[in-house]
Amino acid sequence: MLILIIIMDNPIFLPNQVLVAADLKIYFDSIGLLIGAYTIINGIFIIISGYLTDKYERKLLLIVSGFIWSATVIFYLFITQYWQLFLERMLAAIATGFTTPVTISYIADMVSQKSRSKSFAIWGLISAVASVFASIFALSFNTIDFESISGLSINEKINYIRTNFPNQLYTWKLPYLLLGITALIITTINIFLTVEPKRGSKDLYLKESLSDEMVKYTYKIRLSDFKNLFKRKSNIFLTINFFDVVASGLLLAYIFPYIELEIGINVIDARVLVLLLFAGIFGLFLGQFILAHWGDKKVQKGDVSGRVKVAVICSILTLPFLLIAFSMSPNATNDTFFFNAVKVNDVGFWILWIVYCSFLGIGLAFTMGIGPNWYSSLIDLNLPENRGSIVAIGSFVDSIGRSMGAIMGGFIVHATQSFSATIFWSTLIFGILSIFLWVPLFYTTPKDFEYIHNILKERSLNLKEQRKD
């Protein structure tokens, strides 16, 4: 529960970016820098906490994270300047940086190796639901009527909101205050209730040996392990591919301003509900479950690199669907599509809107199918004492890609006044580049899986000897 509240941090901030910009008299170039810096700091502390996760009790890291985050967001109430928000967001980034390695490490030690992709998919669903709740919760305090603001550029709309809605600008702080107090209470409770699972107890070759409560997995990460991690080529290709997340980082950062300022509709509009419905059906069901289950099944049938193959296929198939969706560029204020080139009536708008939502939903499904299989592959390709660290390294590189998307996107949107064009070209360029780093995994993973499995078999024999003693 505590982890779910902490990971709500960004989903609370992103829906109310327009309010934040209007409140603090800034524009999307400053917002982009803020989101980018947050992502980088978050990534740095993911690496630090990944190492700490492999070395110390994860319960302690979770509690520290809870206290830092809750104290930080409660003090958002007193922010009046951009620099204050910047510092506070960096502290929040530190706190959220602890959650990824702790979560992945917990799941790896609580769920059978054969079903890891499915377990990560379930966690993805739970965290997605938490994010949606956080966004809806944040938007419930935002009463700006975006549909009434038409015929203005993005920056002019922000100025209009600042001038005409002065009594509503502070409301972006309220959801943070309420969730911060809740997190503070839950963190205190977790000191007494959280249980630490046994490391390695769900691995295929260690499960039997570690079923004895007297036998513990005593291997700990050493600093010298880091140079050995990347002797396995699969780790290199799985972790350095930041191109894969540049476009998604941009989309995630600006999805709400894109809907409110460029498409020109309120987030609670029926058309947005249709969009979310398609994204939920295709993205969560097909992406998080069907594709994750497919990866698990391939491994269970003896294809040790099956999850990697599914991730590669997803990375390729996501491109055409997202490119078609963002090329449609709907605008509800003047009933047009394709960058104002095609004007339609109300019926035509709904038909094309559903087509747009379908392409976007299928594209998101393949995008979301990558995550569970990627995490599972990283876990399977590394020893239990190294998993938190390798996931942290991969997440840090991801954060670089996402921050690039947010920062570049902020400046490009500020210059071009177009979210659609910015997202379209970033998806095309960085999507093609990422494919070149996915394909080599077809050839590197079988050898690396065999290497790890042989080590775990040997350790299993050693642990069985401990049981006899």
Residue ranges with predicted function:
Residues 11, 39-47, 131-132, 281-289, ...:
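Residue-level signature of mid-helix packing/kink "hotspots" within the transmembrane helices
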Residues 44-83:
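Conserved MFS/SLC helix-loop-helix module at the cytosolic interface between two early adjacent transmembrane helices
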Residues 197-239, 262-265, 343-346, 457-467:
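Juxtamembrane intracellular "pre-TM" segments in multi-pass secondary transporters
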Residues 13-14, 232-284, 288, 371, ...:
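Extracytoplasmic gate region of multi-pass secondary transporters
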Residues 60-74, 305-323:
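Structural signature of the two symmetry-related core transmembrane helices
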Residues 123-194:
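Helix-loop-helix hairpin linking two adjacent transmembrane segments in secondary transporters
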Residues 1-28, 251-256:
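Extracytoplasmic
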Residues 88-127:
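Cytoplasmic helix-loop-helix junction between adjacent transmembrane helices
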